[in-house]
Amino acid sequence: MSNNMDKQSYIDEAEKELLHTYNRFSLVLDYGEGVHLYDTDGNAYLDFAAGIAVCALGYSNEHHKEALKAQVDKLLHTSNLYYNAPVIEAADKVLNASKMDRIFFTNSGTEAIEGAIKAAKKYAFTRDGHAGHEIIAMNHSFHGRSIGALSVTGNAHYQEPFEPLMPGVKFADFNDLESVKAQVTDKTCAIIMETIQGEGGIYPAKKEFIEGVRALCDEKDILLILDEIQCGMGRSGEMFAWQNYDVKPDIMTCAKALGCGVPVGAFLMTQRVADKSLAPGDHGTTYGGNPFVGAAVSAVFDEFKRLDIVSHVKEVAPYLEKKLDELVAKFDCLTARRGMGLMQGVECSLPVGKVSAEALNQGLIVITAGSNVLRFVPPLVIEKSDVDEMIEKLETTLVILSKSL
């Protein structure tokens, strides 16, 4: 296949060869710089999706690139039969930021969820055998598409074609403490939730809810698993979203911005859980935690520190919220804004898929969450001027669609 094909030729080739698991936009992206992406026709797009909350540092960050190039020249992979320095350095940085005690690196977010589930089940087995195996998850949640992660994803649309799934999962309503309490039995080993529900429509946990769940877990010796795959890594205005509350998880997961484009995830736990859960032979990975991803994670944390990303999010996020609120007040098709930090959602009565498509015509990348929410998860390095540009492009989009639909 030639590297000089036109856009339609690339698309035609993809439609013949790639498994049709995505309804893609008719766009072939070529390169990125800062907070902009460029397609093969040379068109520029202001990116307010960041590869679905992945590219926190934007595109072509020099420190990140140089760290990856240096590691490619040195050592890509060894296996976990041996130690390697880059992943040990990365582990230290993640643990220091999270105040957790132990970490296992995976290749993705869904693998991190699988590991977290296994750790919780092994902890319960060590404590009382197979008696305590049930997990409480949240309605409208999303944790991934592998079987274990899908089993704790509270959306029948994703689950039904793959049933029967993992047994022993119950669902409660997010931000409803009494609903969670009603599902607890002496068989409950863990409660899993996103600190901010993402795919479900951008719903941050209410303070009284998440702190109430933490207290419930303490009372019943239940493990609290917090999924920080999308909302973690500075996006909320703290390094991890749970740090906005008076809670600490027993197990947490992260991925996406952890490698800023390099495939890597992780699940972390307290020493108490580590002492009674996964031991040699219980879990493993071929690629997870190799030197290349270790260098990537380490470079990301170095850049977060150098650029003071968390403080920057705290500065820019209120401006984004203000401008989105003004937009909601201006357009009847927009009904509500909610979110935390640079993870925001706006309810829209127009077909949100069509809004995303028309936004591309205006040079803006914005994605959806749920059936009626526009999701804003830009690179964390955006400036207020980028927010202004986004609002201008989105206004144009909404005006066009309001007239045509």
What is the meaning of each model-derived region?
Residues 2-405:
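Conserved N-terminal phosphate-binding loop of PLP-dependent enzymes in the Aspartate aminotransferase
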